[in-house]
From Swiss-Prot:
CDD domains named in the record: ASKHA_NBD_actin
Pfam families cross-referenced by the UniProt entry: Actin (PF00022)
UniProt protein name: Actin-1
Function according to Swiss-Prot or TrEMBL: Actins are highly conserved proteins that are involved in various types of cell motility and are ubiquitously expressed in all eukaryotic cells.
Organism whose genome encodes this protein: Aedes aegypti (Yellowfever mosquito)
Sequence positions bearing N-acetylaspartate: 3
Gene Ontology terms: cellular component: cytoplasm; cytoskeleton
Gene that encodes it: ACT-1
Similarity-based family: Belongs to the actin family.
Length: 376
């Protein structure tokens, strides 16, 4: 690894989790929830060092007395004051670096509004005094991490899912499709269907418990109807989960009904296409000559693609949509939860990339709009 003094920082700000670390490392050093919590009640304890806000894991552990807010919604930053708190926490508390000493690579959602990239650039240079920075598109980094430069990435995180076709390293913007259906919606849906079983989860703190149930017990059925029949006929698919207070709850068909919403958004009352159709539609928006390469390089990325069974189901669904002669390959790397970050780590440590950074000097000369000229 290059000397830590000037190692570039790679920060992948997701809607649910923030992943941060040093370029050249093979995994992020810090992974923490993208949340800012504020006390719900007036402090009564003496010597508690009353803070007006908590970030990340600390907010998570004190969630019972806080109101939790996510500054990134659907992949796009909506609350800049809270976002600054998260970046501050990333640099000073998690990585323990002085941001003015390291170039920083940030990631952004595909089709991020132009004003957002400018604001990110401005905050890095003016608030944190970064010597250099760059903004990269998340899905492109995931593809790099899989060792490819051509393919289609289905990137599904906590707040948003995208299908991004990439040819020779360039995202094809006209064919990028966005689906506002991701991990957070599945957590909400699981809360709802658990209520049907008579379990009640309502507060922001309880939602985090349901998220944990989802991550530990849910899976994608290869054949939904058949799985429902199996679940109805026997208890073989039931699992139990112990809540923090010791109460044990049992969950059965909810285990696969929850992620099924990715393939059938009508479960959530949404009219959009499922993830399999979205991938297919995205491919069909591309030039006919490159479609074959996209079908053969379909890469899954992000935490919401971590369900067991998702790759097999994708293979089955896309095979049903595509021409019969075509070879379809779904690539689901085991580290796909972090592949955006890993791709950023690879990119920022390439010798050929060093000329791509936006320097403080360029920013001072051109202002925030420089980001559109240098990052594409």
């Amino acid at each position: 690894m290059c000397d830590e003094d000037a190692a570039a920082l790679v920060v992948d700000n997701g809607s649910g989790m923030c992943k941060a670390g040093f370029a050249g490392d093979d995994a992020p050093r810090a992974v923490f929830p993208s949340i800012v919590g504020r006390p719900r009640h007036q402090g009564v304890m003496v010597g508690m060092g009353n803070k007006d806000s908590y970030v990340g894991d600390e907010a998570q552990s004190k969630r019972g007395i806080l109101t939790l807010k996510y500054p990134i919604e659907h992949g796009i930053i909506t609350n800049w004051d809270d976002m600054e708190k998260i970046w501050h926490h990333t640099f000073y508390n998690e990585l323990r670096v002085a941001p003015e000493e390291h170039p920083v690579l940030l990631t952004e959602a595909p089709l991020n509004p132009k004003a957002n990239r400018e604001k990110m650039t401005q905050i890095m240079f003016e608030t944190f005094n970064s010597p250099a920075m760059y903004v990269a598109i998340q899905a492109v980094l995931s593809l790099y991490a899989s060792g490819r430069t051509t393919g289609i990435v289905l990137d599904s995180g906590d707040g948003v899912s995208h299908t991004v076709p990439i040819y020779e390293g360039y995202a094809l913007p006209h064919a990028i499709l966005r689906l506002d259906l991701a991990g957070r919606d599945l957590t909400d849906y699981l809360m709802k269907i658990l209520t049907e079983r008579g379990y009640s989860f309502t507060t922001t703190a309880e939602r985090e418990i349901v998220r944990d149930i989802k991550e530990k017990l849910c899976y994608v059925a290869l054949d939904f109807e058949q799985e429902m029949a199996t679940a109805a006929a026997s208890t073989s698919l039931e699992k139990s989960y112990e809540l923090p207070d010791g109460q044990v709850i049992t969950i059965g068909n909810e285990r696969f009904r929850c992620p099924e919403a990715l393939f059938q958004p009508s479960f959530l009352g949404m009219e959009s296409c499922g993830i399999h159709e979205t991938v297919y539609n995205s491919i069909m928006k591309c030039d006919v000559d490159i479609r074959k390469d996209l079908y053969a390089n379909t890469v899954l990325s992000g935490g919401t693609t971590m369900y067991p069974g998702i790759a097999d189901r994708m293979q089955k669904e896309i095979t049903a949509l595509a021409p019969s002669s075509i070879k379809i390959k779904i690539i689901a790397p085991p580290e796909r939860k972090y592949s955006v970050w890993i791709g950023g780590s690879i990119l920022a440590s390439l010798s050929t990339f060093q000329a791509m950074w936006i320097s403080k000097q360029e920013y001072d000369e051109s202002g925030p709009a420089i980001v559109h000229r240098k990052c594409f």
